[in-house]
Swiss-Prot record:
Belongs to the SELO family. ATP binds at residues 86, 88-89, 109, 121-122, 172, 179, 258. Its EC number is 2.7.7.-, 2.7.7.108. Nucleotidyltransferase involved in the post-translational modification of proteins. It can catalyze the addition of adenosine monophosphate (AMP) or uridine monophosphate (UMP) to a protein, resulting in modifications known as AMPylation and UMPylation. NCBIfam families: adnlytase_SelO, PRK00029.1. It comes from Salmonella paratyphi A (strain AKU_12601). The gene is ydiU. InterPro entries: adnlytase_SelO (IPR054838), SelO (IPR003846). It catalyses: L-seryl-[protein] + ATP = 3-O-(5'-adenylyl)-L-seryl-[protein] + diphosphate; L-threonyl-[protein] + ATP = 3-O-(5'-adenylyl)-L-threonyl-[protein] + diphosphate; L-tyrosyl-[protein] + ATP = O-(5'-adenylyl)-L-tyrosyl-[protein] + diphosphate; L-histidyl-[protein] + UTP = N(tele)-(5'-uridylyl)-L-histidyl-[protein] + diphosphate. The active site is at residue 248. Keywords: ATP-binding, Magnesium, Manganese, Metal-binding, Nucleotide-binding, Nucleotidyltransferase, Transferase. This is Protein nucleotidyltransferase YdiU. Its cofactor is Mg(2+); Mn(2+). The lineage of its organism: Bacteria, Pseudomonadati, Pseudomonadota, Gammaproteobacteria, Enterobacterales.
């Protein structure tokens, strides 16, 4: 089967990019590809044949129909207007046309210098490409909207960061790479007609049902806000901290995008800061809902030339509604509740307080809670708490709440185990795979990818364990 590519972005938004070709790496070679995703997309196996070199995965060749461009956008970084940004090391190669008429961006990260590289070198390093591949696939299998990873290429090209590292490329796929920052770019250049063209493009291709509706722009922004609210709710319930929620890293489609200094909670710490460059804690875990709203407000400002203020405010209210509704639903599922009762939040907050005091592992606590039996006061979770009396008091109230519903243990446990993962991508697991890969051993990278495909399956090995001492509080930066 021949892959078919289109160039809608290039054809319809000529002011938003620079056309250019990738710059290949020295002795590039494919070290991992997503076989499951490749099969779903009917990508010929021959394209992954190492005897053909790095091929499209290393920017050495293009597939028929590809028209590569680097996109320009701007944004607020750490709450401050940063001006023009853009694809400083990534190139949108083309948009794969799928059988249902939708498209999928093929975006090559680490593809070389672009007009938007600023002081950078246009390269990505092996460490960061591995982290993004693992994170995006982990999020996908957790059921959270995200970009996807298709391939990783390593090379003999040295790249200087804090130390000398190995140049690499990641093929990232997404329904769209349209960002809040695209709209900000033209708004601050005083080109509102181009802001509206971006909105028209989004509606035409992603919300075509509203093309002929008078209030199409208001409806569209309301849906952007709602998708963002649901996404942030998913992050909070699974314990994911993005680390760098700048407006240029926010997806119009409500996807998790641009994995840099991210982290999943180990110990439950609502003030967890994943990015060691975030000295003020702007992007700490418990501040993500507020930051997302602030980012939506910046996007709303760009839309004022063609959406009324009242409609924009209604959409921002929709964000809050979507966030709280989805978060509440997800947390009730995590606790095994099938109905909503007035004291549920009290019970949840009491558990969070206990976990924070004791430094309980976020993922393991909820997974172990999934094995609760209503009539039994014994629980393996009890042994993880030092203050047993406090846990016992909470656990009694929790089991009493479970008994208010006529749901048997087996059904409830089944629901809980579908939403409380046994496996998340802990930073130490990613680092172990990176350390091995940098020594030329890709086995752990492949093994970890396989493990992350089954996050809701219990395991008795170290993939499901708390981090070892060396793996606690690993510092992660924006350097990639």
């Amino acid at each position: 089967m021949t892959l078919s590519f289109t160039a809608r972005w290039r054809d319809e938004l000529p002011a938003t990019y620079t056309a250019l070709l990738p710059t290949p790496l020295k002795n590039a070679r494919l070290i991992w590809y997503n076989d499951e995703l490749a099969q779903q997309l009917a990508i010929p196996a021959s394209l992954f044949d190492a005897t053909n070199g790095a091929g499209v995965w290393g920017g050495e060749t293009l597939l028929p129909g590809m028209s590569p461009v680097a996109q320009v956008y701007s944004g607020h970084q750490f709450g401050v207007w940063a001006g023009q940004l853009g694809d400083g090391r990534g190139i949108l190669l083309g948009e794969q046309l799928l059988a249902d008429g939708s498209t999928l961006d093929w975006h090559l990260k680490g593809a070389g210098l672009t007009p938007y590289s600023r002081m950078g070198d246009g390269r990505a390093v092996l460490r960061s490409t591995i982290r993004e591949s693992l994170a995006s696939e982990a999020m996908h299998y957790l059921g959270i909207p995200t970009t996807r990873a298709l391939s990783i290429v390593t090379s003999d090209t040295p790249v200087q960061r804090e130390t000398q590292e190995t140049g690499a490329m990641l093929m990232r796929l997404a329904q769209s790479h349209m960002r809040f920052g695209h709209f900000e770019h033209f708004y601050y250049r005083r080109e509102p007609e181009k802001v509206q063209q971006l909105a028209d493009f989004a509606i035409r291709h992603y919300w075509p049902q509203w093309q002929d509706v008078a209030e199409k722009y208001a409806l569209w922004f309301e849906e952007v806000a709602a998708r963002t609210g649901r996404l942030i709710a998913e992050w909070q319930t699974v314990g994911f901290a993005h680390g760098v929620m700048n407006t240029d890293n926010m997806s119009i489609l409500g996807l998790t995008i641009d994995y840099g200094p991210f982290g999943f909670l180990d110990d439950y710490d609502p003030g967890f800061i994943g990015n060691h460059s975030d000295h003020q804690g702007r992007y700490r875990f418990d501040n993500q809902p507020s930051v997302a709203l602030w980012n939506l407000q910046r996007l709303a400002q760009t839309l004022t030339p063609f959406i009324e203020i009242d409609a924009l405010n209604r959409a921002l209210d929709r964000y809050q509604d979507a966030l709280l509704t989805h978060y509440g639903q997800r947390m009730r599922q995590k606790l095994g509740f099938f109905t909503e009762q007035k004291d549920d939040n009290v019970l949840l907050n009491e558990l969070f307080s206990l976990m924070a005091r004791e430094g309980s592992d976020y993922t393991r606590t909820f997974r172990m809670l999934s094995h609760t039996e209503q009539q039994s006061a014994s629980s393996p979770l009890r042994d993880t708490f030092i203050d047993r009396a406090a846990f016992d008091a909470w656990f009694d109230r929790y089991r009493a709440r479970l008994r208010t519903e006529a749901v048997d243990d087996a059904l409830r446990q089944q629901q809980m185990q579908r939403v409380n993962p046994a496996i998340v991508l802990r930073n130490w697991l990613a680092q172990r795979a990176i350390d091995a890969a940098e020594q030329g051993d890709m086995a752990e990278l492949h093994r970890l990818h396989e493990v992350l495909r089954q996050p809701f399956t219990d395991r008795d090995d170290d993939y499901a364990s708390r981090p070892p001492e060396w793996g606690k509080r690993l510092e992660v930066s924006c350097s990639s």
